[in-house]
Amino acid sequence: MITLFQCLYLILFSFICYQGAAAFSHSTAASWLAAALGAAAAGLYIWNTKRVWKHCSSGLCAWIAVIQVMSVGVVLIGTDIMPVLCVIAIFAGCEGLRIGQSALQARLSDQIDKLTQAEQHANQMLIDVRSRNHDTMKHITAIKSAQPKADTQAYIQNWADQYSQYDRFLKGENAYVAGVLYDFLEKARASNVSVSLHMHTPLSSLPFSPADQVSLVGNILENALDSAAEAREKAEIKLETSLRSGLYVLTCENSTPGMDPKVLDTIYQSFGRSTKNGAHEGMGTYIIQKLVKGAFGRLDFTYRHPIFRLEIKIPFQK
């Protein structure tokens, strides 16, 4: 269905260019040349915005197509350039609406996915805690039956480490953020990525709704982990939170296999640029930037191979 709308868009824009050239030069050759250039421009636009089209609903595309078809009819009324300019303005407005709504829909879809994942991670964390409690009596029995004191101490230490492994990082976090952190730490351990957390202020204290907290934290940690896991050198992630002069400061550093300079020039500025290798849309970086901007915060990043450093400062009031 989306492909049909794209073809219609290409045909309509070519027709507008044809009519515009005809109004200017009254030459058939010039009109056909303008139509060809218009088709090429429309094709290039569709190619560059293909990630946005994928998130656009069929209903919105249908309404925009109706508006564009009706506006093209205006071109047939007159023979001067004014109707053509009006139609081009209508096309630009429709495409601005399409891109804005598609980006919003993609952001909401990502937020729903992140919340669903956070709930699953929180449930998994609860199951893990319950399973440890379930084995408590078995551990006590094993300690009672142990003979050498050294073995008993080592067993107790190992048992305590299992219980306290993530406790200090999850302290003070709400269930959703705790679920995101728990899943991140488990995936980092499975990927042999070293994690250093300095949580002077809970992530749950971020001045956002729980849904936006999950979106911000989840995307930051996911991007850092994906990049660090691909690093050829020492794979590590450092996350620090603190309060400074009325600002909530979140800093994340991660090793990376390298970044394209073209991506660095536009990262956190436009939809469709990703820090990851492969076919990624850059939706995570887009959402991070939108959330920080919406909270009147500031986002800065630096890249000195092999370390990518992200720093976010957001006004904070208790």
UniProtKB/Swiss-Prot annotation:
E.C. number: 2.7.13.3
Residue intervals passing through the bilayer: 4-24, 27-47, 72-82
Signal peptide as annotated in the record: none
Reaction(s) catalysed by this chain's protein: ATP + protein L-histidine = ADP + protein N-phospho-L-histidine
GO biological process: phosphorelay signal transduction system
Residue intervals of the Histidine kinase domain: 132-318
One cellular component term from this protein's GO annotations in UniProt: plasma membrane
Protein's membrane topology: Multi-pass membrane protein
Protein name from the UniProt record: Sensor histidine kinase NatK
